[in-house]
């Protein structure tokens, strides 16, 4: 026989009006905030990733692929010089 911890049951929580009032506001708000974060380009600025039109420049149209096992540092320096 288990004791009572004083917590409400899950079924009691999800059937309450208070739960749905709170979550009907917060879940769409989080979705809209995430959409704005990505659509305004702020996500690119915060995380430092290039925008889709910045992956390939006019001077560099090839994929920056490291092919050498022993000269990988030189290849990496060559790729980063073009930025």
Swiss-Prot record:
GO terms for biological process: photosynthetic electron transport chain. With its partner (PsbF) binds heme. PSII binds additional chlorophylls, carotenoids and specific lipids. Keywords: Chloroplast, Electron transport, Heme, Iron, Membrane, Metal-binding, Photosynthesis, Photosystem II, Plastid, Thylakoid, Transmembrane, Transmembrane helix, Transport. InterPro entries: PSII_cyt_b559_asu, PSII_cyt_b559_asu_sf, PSII_cyt_b559_CS, PSII_cyt_b559_N, PSII_cytb559_asu_lum. Gene3D superfamilies: Photosystem II cytochrome b559, alpha subunit. Its cofactor is heme b. One of its GO terms (cellular component) is chloroplast thylakoid membrane. The chain crosses the membrane at residues 21-35. It is found in: Plastid, Chloroplast thylakoid membrane. One of its GO terms (molecular function) is electron transfer activity. Its main location: plastid. It holds the Pfam family Cytochrom_B559a. The keyword Heme applies. It is a single-pass membrane protein. Heme binds at residue 23. Heterodimer of an alpha subunit and a beta subunit. PSII is composed of 1 copy each of membrane proteins PsbA, PsbB, PsbC, PsbD, PsbE, PsbF, PsbH, PsbI, PsbJ, PsbK, PsbL, PsbM, PsbT, PsbX, PsbY, PsbZ, Psb30/Ycf12, at least 3 peripheral proteins of the oxygen-evolving complex and a large number of cofactors. It forms dimeric complexes. PANTHER family: CYTOCHROME B559 SUBUNIT BETA-RELATED (PTHR33391:SF9). HAMAP family: PSII_PsbE (MF_00642). This b-type cytochrome is tightly associated with the reaction center of photosystem II (PSII). PSII is a light-driven water:plastoquinone oxidoreductase that uses light energy to abstract electrons from H(2)O, generating O(2) and a proton gradient subsequently used for ATP formation. It consists of a core antenna complex that captures photons, and an electron transfer chain that converts photonic excitation into a charge separation. Belongs to the PsbE/PsbF family. This is Cytochrome b559 subunit alpha. It comes from Ginkgo biloba (Ginkgo). The gene is psbE.
């Amino acid at each position: 026989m288990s004791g009572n911890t004083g917590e409400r049951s899950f079924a009691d929580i999800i059937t309450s009006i208070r739960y749905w009032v709170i979550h009907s506001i917060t879940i769409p708000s989080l979705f809209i905030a995430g959409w704005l974060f990505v659509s305004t380009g702020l996500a690119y600025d915060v995380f430092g990733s290039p925008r889709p039109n910045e992956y390939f420049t006019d001077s560099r149209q090839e994929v920056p692929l490291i092919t050498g096992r022993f000269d990988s540092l030189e290849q990496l320096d060559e790729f980063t010089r073009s930025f």
